[in-house]
Amino acid sequence: GVSPACEHDREQAVTLRTWDGLTIHHGECENVLPTFPTASVDALLTDPPSGIGFMGLTWDRDKGGRDAWIAWLRGVLSECLRVLKPGRAGFVWALPRTSHWTATACEDAGFEVRDIVTHVFGQGMPKSRSLLKPASEHWILIKAPGDLRELRIEENRIGTSKNVPASLSKTPGTVYGGGWRKGIPKAEGGEQQGVGGHDPNSGRWPANFALSHSDDCGDTCAAGCPVEELDRQSGPSSRQNNPTRLTTNIKSGVHFGDSGGASKFFYVAKPSKSEKSRMVTDGNAHPTVKPTRLMRHLIELITEPGELILDPFLGSGTTAVAAQEVNRRLIGIEQSADYCEIAKQRLAQGSLF
């Protein structure tokens, strides 16, 4: 486990529990964040309210309209920026419907928006006849001012088959084929594309795209599953390169080489009932639990082992569970006593990896 030593591990009236480098504060983040030291955390990863009044929940309302909601989130993120070390990164969740509000709040708080990771999934019920079926969510990649800290690309490549893609030359110093490929010189033992050479068999460059199967998928995909649909539209793959659909680790098993579009992106299952409620006495009733595996992926993109993550909207604790599993420290804030208790119970299971 990681060392429990942490600048935030000091007794405060709002501290609910601290253990194994993980701290949960019960309270409003607007009140708790100002008590934290400046430039004391390494990354921000959080799932704030969306501002649409999801399922009639009070905490997800728009605070009185667009401007009021953006001003509220800007205030929270301004404190997050103060607490975050210069040049460090974060991911902030948003629904497509109000992701422009969230991005505006990020920029107004002083962050730079660098990219958006889109998570596409196969389930979701339309909430009215004037809306499309919800099938995607956004994770906005932001950066604090200061020298840019690189993403951890090499540790998070997407697995491929054992076959070198046909478009890559196997002979160092040469270029496969002709035409436009002459603009892509090959490096010794890898491919060089202006960003340094790498071994093509080490996996694909992480994409800003994640996929989840439909709830109705079994051994074969259900109709309308985004994973199956992307593969279908990108063309057939050879039998020996078919992906292992239900693999627990995308970097193991068999993967596509250059065909089969879904294989080019990060696959993560939506959280099952057992995942959400493991070790929770009365079940996990939180309506927007995120997949632990997706949170691990995002954490590993922007932090090193042992570093400290801030989540000011902890919910039922998925970010903390993911941090625990990949040997990171975390400080989380949650306004609901019920969700704090669920998070405590989920974390009591300890690391699974």
What is each residue range found by the language model?
Residues 2-353:
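Core catalytic lobe of class I
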